A protein has these predicted regions:
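N-terminal cap/lid segment of alpha/beta-hydrolase-fold proteins
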Residues: 1-50
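Mobile cap/lid helix-loop segments that gate and shape the active-site cleft of serine hydrolases
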Residues: 7-12, 25, 163-200, 206
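Short beta-strand element of the alpha/beta-hydrolase
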Residues: 50-62
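The conserved beta1-alpha1 loop
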Residues: 59-61, 113, 212
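Primarily recognizes the serine-hydrolase "nucleophile elbow" in alpha/beta-hydrolase
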Residues: 108-180
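Short beta-strand/loop motif that positions the catalytic acidic residue
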Residues: 210-212, 216
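C-terminal catalytic histidine-bearing segment of alpha/beta-hydrolase fold enzymes
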Residues: 221, 225-271
């Protein structure tokens, strides 16, 4: 059977560049180097058209001991179809490094992306930082220190790591107050060095949207509430969405209605 059909273009195609090196870390007794990479997913541009799309920088979790920048990217296609670029970012994990090097890596990635904004077709003035669990901790820390240049090292320092909105999912906030079951997750040996996020909260923090599940048995809801309350007390803008009954890294967080709430927040808060 032969058919001729007319297709109406309702959404963009999506493309992925999966091996972009944004920096490097010393390795093997400081005698070698290992690359820091990011994966960049974008709406496919029309022929000859210049892009200037907003960017979501995404940080995977992994108890600060492991990370996979691509593991959540299939769920991020939804945002790419809405006209956003998404950068899944590698950061150092603590069998190789110590606090605050993971935050330094992420802030370097943000500055790198700003420096290459025209090349990649992204808008360096419209960046959302979003991450889950340990990545949510780094998300909050980097979001709160974008203006004061803390942890800015490694290159591209003529750009800031400031972002316009911050969306941590079930973030760790004050690690000293948490009870972790060692049979469920192994935290880094230097966990006591990880700063209390609330110590960085100021009135001029970028807008925050915090997501947390009421049934989270790994990072309790009280951690997300602690960050929300600290932002509210400081006079910064903060929203919080509690997913009833949702566990840690629950599939509930990637349902269309939750993504729609995230998108609504982003579109209201980006300049």
């Amino acid at each position: 059977m032969k058919q001729t059909i007319r297709v109406q273009i309702r959404e963009p195609g999506v493309i992925l560049a999966g091996e972009i090196v944004y920096g490097q870390r010393r390795a093997w007794g400081n005698l070698s180097y290992r690359p820091l990479k990011l994966s960049l997913m974008r709406p496919r541009p029309s022929s000859g058209a210049a892009q200037n799309v907003p960017l979501i920088v995404w940080l995977c979790g992994g108890a600060f001991t492991e990370v996979d920048r691509d593991i959540w990217l299939p769920e991020m296609v939804w945002f790419a179809k809405k006209g956003y670029a998404i950068a899944g970012v590698d950061y150092s994990t603590t069998y190789r490094t110590r606090f605050p090097e993971s935050a330094e890596d992420v802030k370097l990635a943000i500055r790198f992306l700003k420096a290459h904004a025209a090349e990649y077709g992204i808008d360096g003035n419209r960046i959302v930082l979003m991450g889950e669990s340990a990545g949510g901790y780094i998300t909050a820390l980097c979001g709160l220190t974008g203006k004061n240049r803390e942890f800015d090292t490694g290159g591209f320092e003529n750009y800031t790591s400031e972002v316009q909105a911050v969306i941590p999912w079930y973030p760790l906030v004050r690690l000293s107050g948490m009870k972790i079951e060692p049979d469920r997750v192994t935290l880094p040996h230097d966990i006591t060095a990880y700063a209390d996020i609330t110590g960085y909260v100021t009135r001029d923090a970028p807008p925050f949207l915090i997501l947390h599940g009421s049934g989270d048995s790994l990072v309790p809801l009280s951690q997300g509430e602690l960050l929300y309350d600290s932002l509210q007390k400081a006079g910064a803008y903060a929203d919080m969405i509690v997913l009833e009954g949702a566990e840690h890294a629950d599939t509930a967080f990637v349902q269309p209605e939750v993504k729609a709430l995230i998108l609504d927040f982003i579109e209201k808060k980006l300049p």
